Curated annotation (Swiss-Prot):
It comes from the Bacteria. The gene is oxyS. The keyword Lipid biosynthesis does not apply. FAD binds at residues 13, 32-33, 44, 99, 123, 160, 288, 301-302. Keywords: Antibiotic biosynthesis, FAD, Flavoprotein, Monooxygenase, NADP, Nucleotide-binding, Oxidoreductase. It catalyses: 5a,11a-dehydrotetracycline + NADPH + O2 + H(+) = 5a,11a-dehydrooxytetracycline + NADP(+) + H2O; anhydrotetracycline + NADPH + O2 + H(+) = 5a,11a-dehydrotetracycline + NADP(+) + H2O. GO terms for biological process: antibiotic biosynthetic process. Binds 1 FAD per subunit. Monomer. It comes from Streptomyces rimosus subsp. rimosus (strain ATCC 10970 / DSM 40260 / JCM 4667 / NRRL 2234). This is 12-dehydrotetracycline 5-monooxygenase/anhydrotetracycline 6-monooxygenase. Its cofactor is FAD. Involved in the biosynthesis of the antibiotics oxytetracycline and tetracycline. OxyS starts by catalyzing the stereospecific hydroxylation of anhydrotetracycline at C(6) position to yield 5a,11a-dehydrotetracycline (12-dehydrotetracycline). If the released product is captured by OxyR, it is reduced to tetracycline. However, if the released product is recaptured by OxyS, it performs an additional hydroxylation at C(5), producing 5a,11a-dehydrooxytetracycline, which, following the action of OxyR becomes oxytetracycline. InterPro entries: FAD-bd (IPR002938), FAD/NAD-bd_sf (IPR036188), RIFMO-like (IPR050641).
Length: 503
């Protein structure tokens, strides 16, 4: 069987991409080198923009049902929470969702939609030509080949797909070296000088340029991190042992606090790298395969998730033959600058969490700035991805920005705009008047849904004064209309983002 898309990697990025591709009708195979799902969670939360995207695909309730809401974001553990409440969002918070649970929910959805998932199958080689990609795979029963139109590497920072393509992964080497343990502790952890509200337990050692910080994962289980700066690991390839963590705790905090029942051990650095390019012909990269960074502010999983939602509808339309020729190129053009921005802000945070006394003045100044509403909002927009704006033709300030989840007044009552995106199609939203827009957009009705609303239930929304919006499947506004503009530019926007009209 020839697949439309093969995805290497069944982490959150690969699984969400599989869901998006199946909604577009693409025959999708996910290959995961690990034989079983992992039982530990590197990432622990989803930010506001990711929650919005989950709502748009009908997945929001599953994530929110059991997840605590974190109302304040975190920047460099400086103790001043980021305020999400100033954004026009129904979700001014992050959700505390362990990555294990995120992957469970996304796996279930991908399989329900018809994606095929093979665990214990590793990509080992690839060859591509103008017609497709041949992927060499090693599975439990030996090597075999898979044919597909496109291959997407969602296989992490050490991406095999990226290496097979020979794509450079330039960036900055680490100066922070940490060990992590998810464990129980018999002794009370020190409250002292922690790392802000998200890490209420901790010890800062300016003399050692080191710190210990911990936060609860569940009752009596904590994630403990001990970080040293400019003190490289003796052997970075060696697995972390309990003794490594005990020794680090004792050196920095004076005790290992009776650490026991260890669930997970790992290393952490502030290495930051970005792939030189995200695409080579019919092979693309997404998620950690094209960017890695210090996991400060919980941005990594969310960055990859949003890569998947940006890429999925574009690749699906390309496979369906409805996409304009340049559409797939906009994936890298839009997402690469966003990832570069995340690398910049995490590099800045890496300096701010370094306890070197030389940086104390910088930390104090940054704390003052975080109390300035405009600065706080700017950083909250970065961390949550609520303030992303893609390059878009036109002058209206909403172009290229996410559409808020508006409560629409319809003939059937009030309904949230997000519910119209469950099928991952474009939406032409009219507010009070749908003619002649419906006629002009009729030739795209196989790709774009017309949603006619009488208006918005909440006064003072971001769309006040507009009569219509064209919104891409990923929730970003690509055309607006006001009474004075009429339908000017609608056909051009439809062609740009959804291809030529149906015959």
């Amino acid at each position: 069987m020839r697949y439309d898309v093969v995805i290497a990697g069944a982490g959150p990025t690969g699984l969400m991409l599989a869901c998006e591709l199946r909604l577009a009708g693409a025959r999708t195979l996910v290959l995961e080198r690990l034989a079983e799902p992992v039982d530990f969670s590197k990432a622990l939360g989803v930010h506001a923009r990711t929650v919005e995207l989950l709502d748009m695909r009908g997945l929001g309730e599953g994530f929110q049902a059991e997840a605590p809401k974190l109302r304040g974001g975190n920047f460099a553990s400086l103790g001043v929470p980021l305020d999400f409440s100033s954004f026009d969002t129904r979700h001014p918070y992050a959700l505390f969702v362990p990555q294990v649970r995120t992957e469970e929910l996304l796996t279930g959805r991908a399989l329900e939609l018809g994606a095929e998932l093979r665990r214990g199958h590793a990509v080992t080689a690839l060859e591509q030509d103008a017609d497709g990609v041949t992927v060499s795979v090693t599975g439990p029963e030996g090597p075999y080949e898979v044919e597909c139109a496109y291959l997407v590497g969602c296989d992490g920072g050490g991406s095999t797909v990226r290496k097979l393509l020979g794509i450079d992964f330039p960036g900055q080497d680490p100066h922070m070296f940490a060990v992590i343990a998810d464990a129980r502790f018999r002794e009370e952890l020190p409250h002292g000088e922690g790392m802000g509200p998200m890490r209420p337990y901790g010890v800062m050692r300016h003399d050692l340029r080191a710190w210990f910080a911990a936060f609860p994962l569940e009752p009596d289980v904590y994630r403990a991190t001990v970080a040293f700066f400019d003190r490289p690991y003796a052997d970075r390839r060696a697995p972390v042992t309990e003794e490594d963590v005990r020794a680090a705790l004792t050196e920095v905090a004076g005790s290992d606090f009776g650490m026991h029942d260890v669930r997970w051990l790992s290393r952490l650095t502030d290495t930051s790298r970005q792939a030189e390019r995200y695409r080579d012909g019919r092979v693309l990269l997404a998620g950690d395969a094209c960017h890695i960074h210090l996991p400060a502010g919980g941005q990594g999983l969310n960055l990859g998730f949003q890569d998947a939602v940006n890429l999925g509808w574009k690749l699906g339309a390309t496979i369906a033959g409805t996409a304009p020729p340049e559409l797939l190129d906009t994936y890298e053009a839009e997402r690469r600058p966003i990832a570069a921005g995340v690398l910049r802000n995490t590099r800045a945070q890496a300096v701010l969490i370094d306890p070197d006394p030389r940086y104390e003045g910088l930390r104090e100044l940054m704390i003052e700035l975080l109390h300035v509403p405009e600065t706080n909002r700017y950083l909250a927009g970065l961390i949550s991805a609520l303030d992303v704006r893609y390059p878009m033709a036109g002058e209206h300030p909403l172009l290229g920005r996410r559409v808020p989840d508006l409560p629409l007044v319809t003939e059937d009552g009030t309904r949230q705009l997000s519910t119209y995106f469950h099928a991952a199609r474009g939406v032409l939203l009219t507010l009070g008047c749908d003619q002649p827009l419906a006629d002009e957009a009729a030739a795209w009705k196989d790709r774009v849904d017309l949603v006619a609303a009488e208006g918005v239930a909440d006064p003072g929304s971001a769309v006040d004064g507009l009569t219509a919006l064209l919104v891409r499947p990923d929730g970003y506004i690509c055309w607006t209309a006001a009474p004075e503009t009429g339908t000017d530019g609608l056909t051009d926007a439809l062609r740009t983002w959804f291809g030529p009209p149906a015959m």
